[in-house]
């Protein structure tokens, strides 16, 4: 399974693919062909769900 990185943003937290990186200033994920994903906290791990 692919792993995702969590990007913190002002309104929401999104996830990026492992290869992709987050913008430092805007703290947003790079453009993806698929829909954007957001991070959800579950116990001690972060998981991504389709937004």
Curated annotation (Swiss-Prot):
Its main location: nucleus. The keyword Manganese does not apply. It holds the Pfam family Protamine_P1. It is found in: Nucleus; Chromosome. PROSITE patterns: PROTAMINE_P1. GO terms for biological process: chromosome condensation; sperm DNA condensation. Keywords: Chromosome, Developmental protein, Differentiation, Disulfide bond, DNA condensation, DNA-binding, Nucleosome core, Nucleus, Spermatogenesis. One of its GO terms (molecular function) is DNA binding. Testis. This is Sperm protamine P1.
């Amino acid at each position: 399974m692919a792993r995702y990185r969590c990007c913190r943003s002002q309104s929401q937290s999104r996830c990026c693919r492992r290869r992709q990186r987050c913008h430092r200033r805007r703290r947003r994920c790079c453009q993806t062909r698929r829909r954007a994903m957001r991070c959800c906290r579950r116990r001690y791990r972060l998981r991504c769900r389709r937004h």
